[in-house]
From Swiss-Prot:
This is Peptidyl-prolyl cis-trans isomerase G. Keywords: Isomerase, Isopeptide bond, Nucleus, Phosphoprotein, Rotamase, Ubl conjugation. Its main location: nucleus. One of its GO terms (molecular function) is peptidyl-prolyl cis-trans isomerase activity. It comes from the Eukaryota. Residues 182-193, 226-251, 327-345, 448-461, 599-625 have a biased composition (Basic residues). One of its GO terms (biological process) is protein folding. Residues 685-705 have a biased composition (Polar residues). The modification Phosphoserine is found at residues 252, 254-255, 257, 288, 313, 354, 384, 395, 411, 413, 685, 688, 694, 742-743, 751. It is found in: Nucleus matrix; Nucleus speckle. The lineage of its organism: Eukaryota, Metazoa, Chordata, Craniata, Vertebrata. The RS domain is required for the interaction with the phosphorylated C-terminal domain of RNA polymerase II. It catalyses: [protein]-peptidylproline (omega=180) = [protein]-peptidylproline (omega=0). PPIase that catalyzes the cis-trans isomerization of proline imidic peptide bonds in oligopeptides and may therefore assist protein folding. May be implicated in the folding, transport, and assembly of proteins. May play an important role in the regulation of pre-mRNA splicing.
Length: 752
C-alpha cells in the first residue's frame, strides 16, 4: 500500500455585479498532470510576478468569466484582455497538452481552454454537463469540490449573441487552500522537541539503574518504550490542562475588571414611586377634560366585564347581535345593514315592491303603444320624411311617362319636343326655371362628356382615314410625276429618232402604238388594285365604328333597365313606409281626441262648480284648437307644394331623358343611312373610276399621236388635226360630266 499524497486545493471568491455570490473550491489532479496543476495554482496565488509577453501580473484576481453557455460550460481566465483573446501561462506563452487520461464524463470538471493542439495558456472552463466530444482535445486537471450552486448561478446569467453575460461575473479573490493536517503535524513536531528534552533527563537516571540489572534483555527495551509512550501521554495531558488554566486566568481578570466598573458606577437614591407621571398632550383638545370619577367608573366596569367573560368566550352583547332575515339567513358582522336579500319569488313582490315606480311604468307603456313595428329595416339614403314623400310622388309618374315616351319615340321628332319644352318653360316661375337649369346643366355635362368621347373616337378614326388617303394621294402623285417625266424623255428621244428616221415604214408606227396601249393597260390595272385596297380599309374602319356604337347602345340600354328596376323598388318601399306612418298618425290623432273628450267631461263637471274659470279655459281651448288647425293647414300646404315641385321636376327630367333617347336614336338612324350611302358609293365608285381611268388613258394616247403626227405632217394637216383634237376634248369633257353625275361619292373617296 503506497502512501496517499493529498492533492492541492484552490478557491475563487466570485461576485456578480459587485455583489458576493459565494466561494468555489477546486481540487487539482496533480498526480495525473502536475505541470498544468502547478500553472493553475501559481495563477491562483499570483506568486510568479508579471508575464513575459503580456507584461501583466500572472494572477486570476479581478478576472472576468467572459463566456457562459447554458447546459455546456462556464469559461474564464483571460487576465490580460478579458474577452477570450488574451492570457499567458507561467512558463511564458503557451505550453503543450500534458495528458488526456481524465475524460469529460461528468459535470463540474476543471479543464484547460486552448486554440488548438499544444496551445494551453491561462484560460480554463468548468463543465456543467458531461461533454464527451471534448475528449482528446482539452486537458482535464481538476474538479469542483464545493460551490456548485455558484457555478449554476453563473450558468443561468443572461447573455448576448456572443455568449457574453450581461452581468459582470468577476473573481474577487483567489488562492490556495492549505489543509489542517499539515498544521497539526507542525505543532506536534514542536511539542515532541520540547517533550524529548524533559524526558531525556528522567530516562538517563532510570537507564543507569536498570543497565546494571538487565542490559541484555529485550523485554526491558519494550517496557521502556511503553513507559515513554505513557509519559508522553501524561505530558500532553498536562499541557492541555495548563492551556485551559491559562485561558481561564485570562478570562478571570477581564470579569474582575467588569465587576470593578459596576461597583464604581454611582447608584440612584430616588424611589420609583416618587417619579411623577408623564403629562398628556392636550394642546389641541377642545372638549372639557373628563372628570376623575368617570374614569374610575369606566375602569371598574371593564374589570367586571373581564371577570365575567373569560378570554375565550364571546361577550353576550356580541352574541345578541346575530340577526335573522325573514328567509332564515343569519346576518353577521358589525355596523348597519346596507343590503337587502332579494325575494326568491319575484311574482309576489312585483306590485308591492317593483323595480320601477308606477309613474315611470305608465310612461314606458305609453311610449311602447305609440311605436308601430315596421317590418322593413332602415335603408341607406332615407334622410328625412320629405325625401320619402318626394320619391313616393316621383316613382309612379316616372314609370308612366317612361312608357309613354317609349311609345312616342318613333312618332315624335326632336324639333317638336323642343317646341313643347319651350312652351312649358314659358308657363313656369323663375324658381322652377333655376331648378330646371341646374338639372339640365348636369344632364348637358353628362351628354357633353359622352359626345366628347364619341367625337374623340370618331375623330381618331377620321384622322386615320385621312392619313391613309393622304398617303395614297402622295403615292399617286409620285407615280404620275414619274410617268410625266418618262413621257417627256420619251418624247425628246422620239423627236430625235423621227428626225433621223423619217423614212421608216408605217409598220413600225403600228408596233409602237400597240406597245403603248399595252403599257397603258398595265398602268390602269395597277391603279384599280390600289383603289380596291383603299376601299377595303375604309370598309374595315366603318365596321369597327359600327361595332363600337352597338356596344355603347347595349350598355346604355342595360343601365336604363337597371335604373327602372331601382326606381320601382324605391317607390314600393316609400309607399309601404308612408302607409305605416299614416296609420300611426291616425292612431295618435284618435288617442289625442279621446284624451280631449275625457278632459272636457271633467272640465264640464268643474265648470258647474266654478263658472268663472270655465270661460277662461274655453278661450284657451279655442286658441289651442285654432293654432293646431292652422299648423295642420300649413303642413298640408307645404306637402302639396313639395309634391307639385317633385312632380314637375320629375316631368322635366323624364322629358329631357326622352329627348336624349330620341336624339340618340335619330343619330343612330342618320349614321346608318350615311353608312348605307357610303356603301352604295363604294359599290358604284370602282366601276366609274375604271371607266374614267380608261377614258383618260385613251385621251392621252390620242393627244400624243396628234403631237407626233403634227411634227411630221404639213401645217395644213396640223390645222385639221387640231380641229379634230378639239372635238375629241369636247367629247371627253361630256363623258366626264356624265361620270360625275352617275357617281357622287368618288370625290369623297379620293379626298378620304
Amino acid at each position: 500500500m503506497g502512501i496517499k499524497v493529498q492533492r492541492p486545493r484552490c478557491f475563487f471568491d466570485i461576485a456578480i455585479n459587485n455583489q458576493p455570490a459565494g466561494r468555489v473550491v477546486f481540487e487539482l489532479f496533480s498526480d495525473v498532470c502536475p505541470k498544468t496543476c502547478e500553472n493553475f495554482r501559481c495563477l491562483c496565488t499570483g506568486e510568479k510576478g508579471t508575464g513575459k509577453s503580456t507584461q501583466k501580473p500572472l494572477h486570476y484576481k479581478s478576472c472576468l468569466f467572459h463566456r457562459v453557455v447554458k447546459d455546456f460550460m462556464v469559461q474564464g481566465g483571460d487576465f490580460s484582455e478579458g474577452n477570450g483573446r488574451g492570457g499567458e501561462s507561467i512558463y511564458g506563452g503557451f505550453f503543450e497538452d500534458e495528458s488526456f487520461a481524465v475524460k469529460h464524463n461528468k459535470e463540474f470538471l476543471l479543464s484547460m481552454a486552448n486554440r488548438g493542439k499544444d496551445t494551453n495558456g491561462s484560460q480554463f472552463f468548468i463543465t456543467t454537463k458531461p461533454t464527451p466530444h471534448l475528449d482528446g482535445h482539452h486537458v482535464v486537471f481538476g474538479q469542483v469540490i464545493s460551490g456548485q450552486e455558484v457555478v449554476r448561478e453563473i450558468e443561468n446569467q443572461k447573455t448576448d449573441a456572443a455568449s457574453k453575460p450581461f452581468a459582470e461575473v468577476r473573481i474577487l479573490s483567489c488562492g490556495e487552500l492549505v489543509p489542517k493536517s499539515k498544521v497539526k503535524k507542525e505543532e506536534k513536531k514542536r511539542h515532541k522537541s520540547s517533550s524529548s528534552s524533559s524526558s531525556s533527563d528522567s530516562d538517563s537516571s532510570s537507564d543507569s539503574q536498570s543497565s546494571s540489572d538487565s542490559s541484555d534483555s529485550e523485554s526491558a527495551s519494550e517496557e521502556k518504550s511503553r513507559k515513554r509512550k505513557k509519559k508522553h501521554r501524561k505530558n500532553s495531558r498536562k499541557h492541555k490542562k495548563e492551556k485551559k488554566k491559562r485561558k481561564k486566568s485570562k478570562k478571570s481578570p477581564s470579569s474582575e475588571s467588569e465587576a470593578d466598573n459596576v461597583d464604581a458606577q454611582p447608584q440612584s437614591t430616588v424611589r420609583p414611586e416618587e417619579i411623577p407621571p408623564i403629562p398628556e398632550n392636550r394642546f389641541l383638545m377642545r372638549k372639557s377634560p373628563p372628570k376623575a370619577d368617570d374614569k374610575e367608573r369606566k375602569n371598574r366596569e371593564r374589570e367586571r366585564e373581564r371577570e365575567c367573560n373569560p378570554p375565550n368566550s364571546q361577550p353576550a352583547s356580541y352574541q345578541r347581535r346575530f340577526l335573522v332575515t325573514r328567509f332564515g339567513r343569519k346576518i353577521k358582522g358589525r355596523g348597519p345593514r346596507r343590503y337587502r336579500t332579494p325575494s326568491r319569488s319575484r311574482s309576489r313582490d312585483r306590485f308591492r315592491r317593483s323595480e320601477t315606480p308606477p309613474h315611470w311604468r305608465q310612461e314606458m307603456q305609453r311610449a311602447q303603444r305609440m311605436r308601430v313595428s315596421s317590418g322593413e329595416r332602415w335603408i341607406k339614403g332615407d334622410k328625412s320624411e320629405l325625401n320619402e314623400i318626394k320619391e313616393n310622388q316621383r316613382s309612379p309618374v316616372r314609370v308612366k311617362e317612361k312608357k309613354i315616351t317609349d311609345h312616342r319615340h318613333m312618332s315624335e321628332s326632336p324639333n317638336r319636343k323642343i317646341e313643347k319644352e319651350k312652351k312649358v318653360k314659358d308657363h313656369k316661375s323663375e324658381s322652377k326655371e333655376r331648378d330646371i337649369r341646374r338639372n339640365s346643366e348636369k344632364d348637358d355635362k353628362y351628354n357633353k362628356n359622352k359626345v366628347k368621347k364619341r367625337g374623340k373616337s370618331k375623330s381618331r378614326s377620321k384622322s386615320k382615314e385621312r392619313s391613309k388617303s393622304k398617303e395614297r394621294d402622295s403615292k399617286h402623285s409620285r407615280h404620275e410625276d414619274k410617268r410625266v417625266r418618262s413621257r417627256s424623255k420619251e418624247r425628246d428621244h422620239e423627236t430625235t429618232k423621227e428626225k433621223e428616221k423619217q423614212l421608216d415604214s408605217k409598220g413600225k408606227d403600228q408596233e409602237r402604238s400597240r406597245s403603248k396601249e399595252n403599257s397603258k393597260q398595265v398602268e390602269s390595272k395597277s391603279n384599280e388594285h390600289d383603289h380596291s385596297k383603299s376601299k377595303e380599309k375604309d370598309r374595315r374602319a366603318q365596321s369597327r365604328s359600327r361595332e363600337r356604337d352597338l356596344t355603347k347602345s347595349k350598355h346604355s340600354y342595360n343601365s336604363r333597365t337597371r335604373e327602372r328596376s331601382r326606381s320601382r323598388d324605391r317607390s314600393r318601399r316609400v309607399r309601404s313606409r308612408s302607409h305605416d306612418r299614416d296609420r300611426s298618425r291616425s292612431k295618435e290623432y284618435h288617442r289625442y281626441r279621446e284624451q280631449e273628450y275625457r278632459r272636457r267631461g271633467r272640465s264640464r263637471s268643474r265648470d258647474r262648480r266654478t263658472p268663472g274659470r270655465s270661460r277662461s279655459k274655453d278661450r284657451r281651448r279655442r286658441r289651442r284648437d285654432s293654432r293646431s288647425s292652422e299648423r295642420e293647414e300649413s303642413q298640408s300646404r307645404n306637402k302639396e307644394k313639395y309634391r307639385s315641385q317633385d312632380s314637375k321636376s320629375s316631368h322635366r327630367k323624364e322629358n329631357s331623358e326622352g329627348e336624349k333617347r330620341m336624339y340618340s336614336k335619330s343619330r343612330d338612324h342618320s349614321s346608318s343611312n350615311n353608312n348605307r350611302e357610303k356603301k352604295a358609293d363604294i359599290d358604284q365608285s370602282p366601276v366609274s373610276k375604271t371607266k374614267q381611268s380608261s377614258q383618260d388613258n385613251e385621251v392621252k394616247s390620242s393627244t400624243l399621236k396628234n403631237q407626233e403626227d403634227e411634227k411630221t405632217r404639213s401645217p395644213v394637216e396640223k390645222e385639221n388635226q387640231k380641229s379634230k383634237g378639239q372635238e375629241n376634248d369636247h367629247v371627253h369633257d361630256k363623258n366626264k360630266k356624265c361620270d360625275h353625275e352617275s357617281s357622287p361619292g368618288t370625290d369623297e373617296d379620293k379626298s378620304g
